[in-house]
Design a protein with these regions (language model features):
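Conserved post-catalytic alpha-helical subdomain immediately downstream of the catalytic base
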Residues: 250, 265-335, 339
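Short catalytic helix/loop segments, enriched in acidic residues and glycine
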Residues: 10-30
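A short helix->loop->beta-strand "cap" motif at the edges of active sites that frequently abuts
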Residues: 155-160, 234-238
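Charged helix-capping and loop-helix junction motifs
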Residues: 116, 144-149, 175-184
């Protein structure tokens, strides 16, 4: 885990002198939805011992209702370990957001399966869902093994596995063969597999539509074909899903989703949403989808709730969302912004 530093008032980083800081990670962005709605959640991570940033992260997780477990690693001096810094502005109008990840000495790269009691976590504690991010799987050789062993243990105990591919070219450079094997094995045991068109093509080698671009609604059949190809390669996956995003401006996006649950397709045609900050919207979609799965909802309801969670987080300054209740999220899906008194 790390922190995100964001200029106030949507200003660019290079001319700002006033910033806000939040704890962040793709995984905790996902589970914040369930935590906010009262489900028990935990993140497996690692901390720098005695670091005020580590304490800031712990405090932030606590206010969200997220439990945490992980080793305290000695910093090792001023050039040793630390928590990553994600420096990102929100953009405005036609000025796009810019993100700079500073991961030098990131303590998360030391995550080791030996530091966790998997029999307790999946057996005694009875974790229902394990969510993995490709960001962590690709951080280092150790974290790749960590995610792989977590997936194997979860499968052994019957825990559902969710895997968001989250491909990052800079993480993969020079490690393509190693990471392709790890990602493919995790995907083969996953129950829910998430990724955009770039993720499926570059992480798993499955052909799909051109990444980004305009008129994304016209590419829905291409997305479906990509998912069907993924289903042939990974027949044990129960749910394949991808979000659709077309950027009109930094403040306005077209937001949609496609999901194949068993043999049932659910398609949310891209709809206009207003955006305060885009980071975390995809994670919130996954969080809403998984919340619905744990609650036993049908496939369509899960996807609609996930879409609305993503739209909800786009209205927030934080990368994560803590819904007041399910009604708030379903109100977004229904397009009902009337004041509630």
């Amino acid at each position: 885990m790390g922190v995100r530093i964001t200029p106030e008032n949507r200003q660019p980083v290079h001319i700002s002198n006033s910033f806000r800081m939040q704890a962040t990670s793709a995984e905790t962005n996902v589970i914040s939805i369930s935590a906010g709605l009262g489900l028990k959640t935990k993140v497996l991570t690692t901390f720098v011992k005695g670091s005020p940033i580590a304490q800031f992260i712990k405090n932030d997780l606590g206010r969200r209702g997220i439990d945490y477990e992980g080793k305290e690693v000695e910093q090792g001096g001023p050039w040793g370990y630390r928590h990553q810094f994600n420096i990102a502005d929100s953009g405005f109008g036609l000025r796009a957001p810019r993100v700079c990840n500073d991961r030098a000495g990131e303590v998360g790269r030391t995550l080791n399966i030996k530091d966790f009691d998997l029999d307790r976590i999946f057996g005694q504690d009875g974790a229902q869902v394990l969510h993995l991010s490709g960001l962590v799987a690709a951080l280092s050789h150790e974290t790749g093994v960590f995610c792989l062993e977590l997936a194997r243990a979860a499968k052994k105990y019957g825990t559902k596995i969710s895997f968001d591919l989250n491909y990052r070219a800079s993480f993969w450079k020079g490690r393509e063969a190693e990471l392709s094997a790890i990602f493919s094995e995790i995907a083969s045991v996953a129950d829910v597999l998430i990724g955009n068109e770039e993720d499926f093509q570059l992480a798993l080698g499955i052909k799909g539509p051109e990444a980004g671009g305009k008129d994304i609604a016209s590419k829905i059949e291409s997305f479906k074909a990509m998912i069907m190809e993924a289903k042939k390669r990974y027949p044990n996956v129960e749910v394949f899903t991808t979000t659709l995003r077309e950027v009109v401006s930094a403040n306005e996006h077209l937001w949609g989703a496609i999901s194949l649950d068993g043999d049932k397709w659910t398609v949310v045609e891209p709809r206009t949403i207003r955006v305060i900050d885009r980071i975390g919207g995809g994670d919130a979609f996954v969080g809403g989808l998984l919340y619905g799965k744990v609650k036993g909802w049908d496939a369509e309801k899960c996807v609609h709730f996930g879409w609305a969670c993503g739209a909800f987080v786009a209205t927030l300054l934080d990368d994560f969302g803590l819904p007041a209740d399910e009604e708030q999220i379903f109100g977004i899906w229904e397009g009902n912004a009337r004041v509630r008194r």
